[in-house]
Amino acid sequence: MSPKTETKASVGFKAGVKDYRLTYYTPEYQTKDTDILAAFRVTPQPGVPPEEAGAAVAAESSTGTWTTVWTDGLTSLDRYKGRCYDIEAVPGEESQFIAYVAYPLDLFEEGSVTNLFTSIVGNVFGFKALRALRLEDLRIPPAYSKTFQGPPHGIQVERDKLNKYGRPLLGCTIKPKLGLSAKNYGRAVYECLRGGLDFTKDDENVNSQPFMRWRDRFVFCAEALYKAQAETGEIKGHYLNATAGTCEEMMKRAVFARELGVPIVMHDYLTGGFTANTSLAHYCRDNGLLLHIHRAMHAVIDRQRNHGMHFRVLAKALRMSGGDHIHAGTVVGKLEGERDVTLGFVDLLRDDFIEKDRSRGIYFTQDWVSMPGVLPVASGGIHVWHMPALTEIFGDDSVLQFGGGTLGHPWGNAPGAVANRVALEACVQARNEGRDLAREGNEVIREATKWSPELAAACEVWKEIKFEFDTIDYL
């Protein structure tokens, strides 16, 4: 045996494989205020003990690998390793449990959601000892969240920019989402904004296709919103989608939007990536642009109960990366979203301090300190009959977005916008008068139809439309 090898042995190095739980399962550990905490739903392979599976998650998402390495002796493993500090059973699920893992703050680069996710969810989800793994929640300590800019402006600054208070904001996604020329697209934008909406929106997959290049769309939409502003006396906006194939092209589109003087741009933050999104958010704050965020691709990640990542984690990540709006489900429309769960992550988007509440899926108390909030956007299969429920569920600090529920009006786009604006104003007035929208909502809408033929026509068209399917993701 060489002297060098003897030296390794003398400091305790022993080659081979040992159980993760011997190093990474530490039920006696007391979490620190600076730790990033994670709650994983773990489904181990048959024969793998819960402690070993939880420890494996902690190891493979922090400092561990499959075998002992002698370079462990060159650092302080106790300082840098993740620790599985608690395990609890999942009620009604014999083969699942929640593993709580604490990560030291020094494992993560400051101000980088990309690095945070690369570490915590980047590799461990393919681990063979696990049948399935889902990240249910993260606790982001102020010591880490303060390294992020967060939303470019936030809720209060947006209201001040728009001079609109005391009600939800109204939007509309232009349909058909693909195939319109830039001029016809701009026409639809103008008609919707003139009819009473606050915003119109590019759909998530409208970028720069052969039928409508981005620069043409930006110019016609800017012309449309300025014309609508002049005619209505209200500040209007259109979410110009700056998402592109490269960060450089994305920034070029955002710069052109700023030169046009429009108030807001848009980004698909999951398909575009967190690095690109954070860069765009920084540009938007520096240049006075609001930033609307679409969550295209989220259901690939978050829809299955046993594997992936819950949207509340993606919502927290977006608040750190930066966005002033984000789509958050509707509860009542065509897209997935259970009420208590949805309201849980809506609070995580908007509020400064959110208490732990397992009944709403919130595993940790979250303190955002001074980070601005994000407006949740309710969009997808909603129409005027949903307005009372949406107003009651989401409150004033939200954006209610009707695509087909505006453009599908039998009289055209502008009457569709009028119908939605009248319905919203009626619901807000009824709520302010003390009426119970959950119980009296339909009556409130019927009363408003007496004064608005546009609303009456909309109510007739969509009176039988419902999306009644069981939610997949429930508590």
Swiss-Prot record:
GO terms for molecular function: magnesium ion binding; monooxygenase activity; ribulose-bisphosphate carboxylase activity. The disulfide bond which can form in the large chain dimeric partners within the hexadecamer appears to be associated with oxidative stress and protein turnover. Mg(2+) binds at K201, D203, E204. Belongs to the RuBisCO large chain family. Type I subfamily. Heterohexadecamer of 8 large chains and 8 small chains; disulfide-linked. The disulfide link is formed within the large subunit homodimers. The basic functional RuBisCO is composed of a large chain homodimer in a 'head-to-tail' conformation. In form I RuBisCO this homodimer is arranged in a barrel-like tetramer with the small subunits forming a tetrameric 'cap' on each end of the 'barrel'. This is Ribulose bisphosphate carboxylase large chain.
